Amino acid sequence: MGSETKHSAKVKIVTRESPPSAKEHMRPTKTQILVPPTQSLPNGKKPNFGKSTKQRREPRERTSKTGHEDDKATMVTVNIDAFLHDKAPKKKSCKYKKKKTRQYQDRAAASIDSKPHVAGHTAFAGASFTTDIPHEAALPKPSFV
């Protein structure tokens, strides 16, 4: 009988660990306070109990947008002038930097190129490339007899 009570206890634990229903998963809603129907105030307006008022677009905004486009165009030209003005001295500094790097690259190329040239001249010092080709001279000439 002791084993049966343990089993029944396990069943209860399993049912408690089972996933809750969909309603329990939902986010708890705010408590809604019942407000009596809005009555007009002495000034004629209805009270606003913490509700956000919707801002309505006015046709004036559409006409003001065209004015803003003109302002944007003038701002763009001013920014371009400032951009070009700022870029002018930077280009000069870039030129000086490029010259320095070119000189460094030329020096590096000269030091690298000087070694292969010496090796190349020593390897083919006695060969003339017009008539003497070593790999063809080593091959036997076919005889058509």
UniProtKB/Swiss-Prot annotation:
Q: Fetch the InterPro entries from UniProt.
A: PNRC-like_rgn (IPR028322)
Sequence ranges of Basic residues compositional bias: 89-102
The answer to whether UniProt assigns keyword Cytoplasm to this entry is yes
Protein location: Cytoplasm; Nucleus
Q: Does the keyword RNA-binding apply?
A: yes
**What segments bear the compositional bias annotation Basic and acidic residues?**
55-73
Tell me the segments the record calls region Disordered: 1-74, 89-115
**Record's protein name:** Enhancer of mRNA-decapping protein 2
The superkingdom listed in its UniProt entry is Eukaryota
Query: Keywords assigned by UniProt?
Result: Cytoplasm, mRNA processing, Nonsense-mediated mRNA decay, Nucleus, RNA-binding
Q: Could you share any additional remarks the record makes about this protein?
A: Present with 538 molecules/cell in log phase SD medium.
Q: Name the species this protein comes from.
A: Saccharomyces cerevisiae (strain ATCC 204508 / S288c)
The text of the family note is: Belongs to the EDC family.
| Major localization class | cytoplasm
Segments spanning the bilayer are none
